[in-house]
Amino acid sequence: MANVIKLRKGLDINLKGKAAKQKFSVKAAAQYALVPDDFVGMTPKVVVREGDKVKAGDALFVNKKQTDVKFASPVSGVVQAVVRGDRRKVLRVVVEADKDQQYVDFGQKQVASLDGDAVVKALLEAGLFGYINQLPYAVSTTPDQKPRAVFVSALRDMPLAGDFEYELQGNEEDLQTGLTALSKVAPVYLGIGAKQTSKALTEAKDVEVNVFDGPCPAGNVGVQVNNIAPVNKGEVVWTVDPTAVIFFGRLFRTGKVDLRRLVAVAGSEITKPEYAEVLVGQPIADLLEGRLAAKNHVRIINGNPLTGRKATMDDFVGGHTSEITVIPEGDNVDEMLGWILPRTNDFSVSRSYFSWLFGKNKEYALDARVKGGERHMIMSGEYDKVLPMDIYAEYLIKAIIAGDIDRMEQLGIYEVAPEDFAVAEFVDSSKLELQHIVRQGLDMLRKENA
């Protein structure tokens, strides 16, 4: 029977524009792109040139520091461009897709007969290993980092997040195959939500199922690691998105790299929020065509409103993206008296507005404004109310800002990822970019321990 872990700390932010459980069709794109920045902590080395012919599954770039970690093309076609930015940083590799797709055949495998080394080798050869992240440091892992355990969270509870159970329909076999494969490497802990009922999750085999009952960010894999088996110095755990587990399962079942995924197109500026089945690297413009309520004064987000990246119509669906969100930018708003005016349509954690009288089910159309500038940390205890982890979050942030590595280690930086602080950043009256601060601290520590 599954373990039930109840979490009281957190905050559910109910936004307008949640995707209905319906699919809309998206045409096959002429171009697809793989973006190295989607794989945090990895320095890319491009292994193709413009004009090269590739199949789906061929490597476009590798990890420069560990070249056996490849990153596979989502489609077959001709490499159209290797786009670089400042200091020749690789921004993306663009492939012009064939009309008839061709795949590298990696061979079907029976995962029950494989050992851990064989599983890792298969993922490396197919260019899928880079979809595995690790704690500490919250970066794309490498095969020399032997994990103590593998954590998979099937609970998506960030604002406007897509329903993984809906995405799972038709992919149950691949999910189980992927979980079984990962269990050959290390014990697997599967985190699900209290309201999730799919048997593919509740009765998953070869894993330990843990049910998390609580508000956002209960679905964050870092929160789940902290509440099940915290990471100590010198230990490594893998964290894997459940969609990536499906990718792994498809590889072992079919012998092909198939990066199809269901993406929620959501937000108050979307006329008809629904799901689209697309490939990793699909142009965002294809998903938003004819669905924007307004073409100007909107914020397009590659991901969810709290942890996603600001995007444009020229960007592409990310390697870990499960939703594309569009909300008002807020740059054309003229409010009389600003925050002083009593109102019922603005969200407030501290009940400064009367909107709390309408209950927790009221939906809000929040915009992208921060509504204030960065200021000193005066209010104590704000982070602790919404961060269900056994750490002193405020003191950890101060230690990172001060660059005190010893103090950072003592306060549990090995256990956290930037997205764990997303809700804390939302409620922070000091308007600090907590996720950016945590990322800087993790990078500093990783460099120090290299």
Task: Annotate each PLM feature.
Residues 1-15, 22-23, 80, 85, ...:
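Mobile cofactor-carrier "swinging-arm" domains
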